Amino acid sequence: MTRWAAFAGITLAVLSLLLVLARLSQSAVTAAPVAPEDRRRLDGLDDGAGHLEAPTAPAPKRTPAEATLGPGPEPTTAALLANVAVSHGLLAALLLGGIWLADVPASALGITSAPLSTGLPAVAVGVAVGTAIALANTLAAGLAEALGTDPSERLRELLAPESPGGWALLLVVVLPVIAGFEELLFRAALVGGFAAGFGVSPWLLAVPSSVAFAAGHGAQGRLGVLVTGLLGFALAAAFVLTDSLLVVVVAHYAVNAVEFVAVEGLELRPFG
């Protein structure tokens, strides 16, 4: 017999832990010493330019307390990728353990023997949905960057690797872990599981699930949170319509992979 109350408690506990970790790690993105647009402007100057001369450089306006308690050195890309992969992996293990202990049926989480649930058709639908969302997302990010308001630019720059090995780690390990865990939590558990266990419409559950999904991406700024909320609802709609966890995992991965490869890897700028 499924213990739905226990499942709900574990799911909400995992969600709370994720939001707390997201809040704590947000400082690594928002406390950057140099803004991305300033970095690009400075990189375009000659090595001997006067902006590097110490006598004319303005002194940092920091009190002793701020110097002691303020953010330390900017974390490396490898450290950030490892942190994301490990934290999401541990939370996924905790959630999967709760699902097993509560004896939640796989069908409630969008996992059945139907081809559209776990077969190649599900992969194809996920690729199609993810590509469509990724195209719109990349165009919107390009326009926002051209206007100097791209909310995700700072986060992408921190996570974008600078070596083939780093890209392999990002695309083969980190992004799949992110997509798998976040879809298991925000779509399969909070939408599918809660709908099956408590008789609530999955369309109704898609709203708070998308709000929670957006809240976990505060590092992208207010505009980024809004965009992420819309993305979350689109993925929730895909989950409800297909009743497939695999579809939304593939779609989520496609969105993230296309954005990183197109914007950071290939440096495509649709609007200059």
Which residues fall in each region the model found?
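Short helix-terminus and kink motifs of transmembrane alpha helices
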Residues: 19-31, 134-142, 187-188, 192, ...
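Transmembrane helix-loop-helix hairpins at the membrane interface
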Residues: 13-18, 154-272
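Structural signal for membrane-spanning alpha-helices in multi-pass inner-membrane proteins
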Residues: 22, 95-100, 129, 133, ...
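Hydrophobic alpha-helical segments
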Residues: 6, 84, 123, 127-129, ...
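Juxtamembrane helix-loop-helix connectors linking adjacent transmembrane helices
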Residues: 100-178, 191, 196
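Generic detector of short, locally flexible boundary/turn motifs and exposed helical patches
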Residues: 71-76, 139-144, 152, 156, ...
